């Protein structure tokens, strides 16, 4: 099908509103994407006419809700080309998924003297859980350094691996720089050293197809709210043999086989033993609707449109005086920048006055900010519903701020 940004925009109610008397230009989808009516309606319809607690219920509503939930798991497995739906765990988001791996697989497999490798461009969600794990067990955290252009110093990677390396935890796409890391070669190198690989896919799955079998990663995790779905729901993919070996992290209902005060508790099989308690079933229904929506548009069509828009944006931003861009020329989704010596918060506030929504701050990537020696950056993110006109408004807004502030 032919991609039409006008038709896409018509599906997103919020894009028709005004901010400060001007049409909203929402350039903050990397933080959280807006939701199409199809997702909003699917979740609302479930709560209106189909809601019930899933699992173990013999009545019709419960059985139907359980079936819908498991059908979404199957749809999500197809979306990332997992071998089986039983390789997917429903989590609250990327952060919980990484913490689950750190506390389940990590506690069982990382020992004193071992090491874990991350990079200098990671989101805090892919740093802090590993710092906590290393502190608990006495392991070492090693870091792949950045280059000034926002790529990783991959030539250093072979020197970081040794026989004690247990895990490479790496972002697919940087949430600040838009850098897409060369996962295939990184994963191959890690496996050659006997290490597992976790990929933070939070900033990748909305921009192009992801094939976890082709990548051969051991763990892949992403949030749905950045993929035009609801908040509070995400997917953790784990290779099936690995997942079945992992102990549960949280205890409670739904994740048990038997509970006895005298003989202890036994667990149900994965993935359900990692889904303690009543799940966010409405969010899961919304997840299914979001996957259906982007799949109907075609991720390859989305990728082509977004890349053309990104190239246009980068070329137009060259006209803004004193603008510093961070990250490589070839990037996905985001453009981080600072204007002269003005604080990112000030620039972001002026842009908001012009109806333009960008993200400002350290973007949960303080080590990256420290590398560039700045306290904060502005970040404009481009999604499938953004337009060339909105890019022009961003450029004009920055030019106007430069004239006002000098």
UniProtKB/Swiss-Prot annotation:
Coiled coil: none annotated. The active site is at 364 (cysteine persulfide intermediate). Its cofactor is pyridoxal 5'-phosphate. The modification N6-(pyridoxal phosphate)lysine is found at residue 226. CDD domains: SufS_like. It is found in: Cytoplasm. Keywords: Cytoplasm, Lyase, Pyridoxal phosphate, Transferase. It holds the Pfam family Aminotran_5. Pathway: Cofactor biosynthesis; iron-sulfur cluster biosynthesis. GO terms for molecular function: cysteine desulfurase activity; pyridoxal phosphate binding; selenocysteine lyase activity. GO terms for cellular component: cytoplasm. It catalyses: (sulfur carrier)-H + L-cysteine = (sulfur carrier)-SH + L-alanine; L-selenocysteine + AH2 = hydrogenselenide + L-alanine + A + H(+). Its EC number is 2.8.1.7, 4.4.1.16. Homodimer. Interacts with SufE and the SufBCD complex composed of SufB, SufC and SufD. The interaction with SufE is required to mediate the direct transfer of the sulfur atom from the S-sulfanylcysteine. Cysteine desulfurases mobilize the sulfur from L-cysteine to yield L-alanine, an essential step in sulfur metabolism for biosynthesis of a variety of sulfur-containing biomolecules. Component of the suf operon, which is activated and required under specific conditions such as oxidative stress and iron limitation. Acts as a potent selenocysteine lyase in vitro, that mobilizes selenium from L-selenocysteine. Selenocysteine lyase activity is however unsure in vivo. Belongs to the class-V pyridoxal-phosphate-dependent aminotransferase family. Csd subfamily. This is Cysteine desulfurase. It comes from Escherichia coli O6:K15:H31 (strain 536 / UPEC).
